[in-house]
Each structure stands twice: as C-alpha cells, then as structure tokens.
Regions:
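Carbohydrate-associated surface elements
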Residues: 57, 76
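Short alpha-helical donor nucleotide-sugar binding micro-motif in glycosyltransferases
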Residues: 134-139
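Active-site proximal beta-strand in glycosyltransferases
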Residues: 8-26, 52
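Conserved donor-binding/catalytic core segment of Leloir-type glycosyltransferases
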Residues: 52, 88-105, 111-114
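Short alpha-helical segment that forms part of, or immediately flanks, the ligand-binding pocket
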Residues: 133, 152-160, 171
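Membrane-proximal helix-turn-helix segments that form the acceptor-binding/catalytic region
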Residues: 32-51
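Aromatic "clamp/platform" in nucleotide-sugar-dependent glycosyltransferases that forms part
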Residues: 147
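Short hydrophobic beta-strand element within catalytic cores of glycosyltransferases
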Residues: 164-167
C-alpha cells in the first residue's frame, strides 16, 4: 500500500503500519524479495506525511531502527457489536485459535503442540465474527501463537469477553 500511496493524489498522506514491514516480508517471501524490502524500507517510510501504528512495540522498533517517529493509535474495539452475542456455556478445556491459517500467525506451531495439550483446540480460521466470538466466549483460553504481530484484535476481543489469552512474546502481545 505504501507504493500506491506514493502516487496517490491527496493533501496529506498517512501510512498505518501493523508490524515491521521487512520482518513480515522476510518471513513470508523469498530472499530476493526480502532483500528488496529491507533495502527500500527506510526510503518508503519517508513518503507519507504521517506514520501511524497500533503497536507500541512497532513504534519503538522503528524509532530504534531508523530514528523514525510513528504516532501510536490503538485500534478501537467496537463493544456495541458484543451486545447481541448469545450467552453460551463454558466448555471445559476448550482452547480457541482465532485467525488466518497462515505461517506468520503460527497456526502450525499450535497444531504441532496439540497432542501435548490437555484440551480440545477449536480453530476459527474461516468463521463469521459472531461464530468466532461465541467460540471464544465458551472457551477456557485463547491461544495466539503468532511469529509476528502488532496488537491483535483477537486479544482485545478475548479480554473483553473475560477469556484469558496465552500468546507468544512478539509485537504487542
């Protein structure tokens, strides 16, 4: 989106970043694409008039890496959406994973560890928001095994539903 933004017409250009771009590209793409991302990252971040991020960890990393300032704008949680959620019964030892089925989200890490877990893991990778929230609400815990992350909405949703979260020590988790 940064490249499109460079040529977009507008009075002010704002780029919102969710995680460290070069690290995300490195984890998901070939070495040549990763090398290109690393070499152009600091230049690309000069194009917008304002940079924002929803993660204090991302804000800190970019300050240390490139001495670039980001505005911290936490992603809001629309609590009105939770008002119409049906009540559900807690399911003992149910563990919820809510997210994409992709490498950076670490779903493979959870699947590899599943045989060692004393509980039933429910994967919400292709469900409606309402269905995923019901599963979170009925679970004992939510697991966020991400390899990289800023501040996942899933964590905020689980906390709002009073469900504890176990996550990897990355980004804003």
């Amino acid at each position: 989106s940064a490249y499109a933004m460079k040529y977009a017409k507008g009075k002010k250009k704002v780029l919102s970043v969710h995680g460290v771009f070069s690290e995300q590209v490195d984890a998901l793409h070939s070495k040549s694409v990763s090398s290109l991302a690393k070499s152009s990252e600091s230049q690309v971040l000069q194009w917008p008039d304002k940079l924002t991020t929803d993660s204090k960890a991302t804000q800190k990393l970019y300050k240390e890496k490139f001495d670039i300032d980001f505005e911290y704008l936490p992603t809001p949680l629309d609590t009105d959406m939770f008002e119409n959620l049906d009540s559900v019964k807690k399911i003992e030892n149910q563990i919820a994973y809510v997210g994409r089925d992709s490498h950076e989200k670490g779903i493979d890490i959870l699947k590899a560890a599943e045989s060692e877990i004393n509980g039933n893991v429910v994967y919400c990778t292709n469900r409606s928001w309402k269905d995923a929230m019901k599963i979170i609400k009925s679970s004992s815990i939510v697991v966020v095994p991400s390899r990289m992350e800023s501040l996942p909405t899933t964590v905020k949703e689980a906390f709002y539903l009073n469900v504890p979260v176990v996550g990897t020590d990355v980004g804003g988790i």
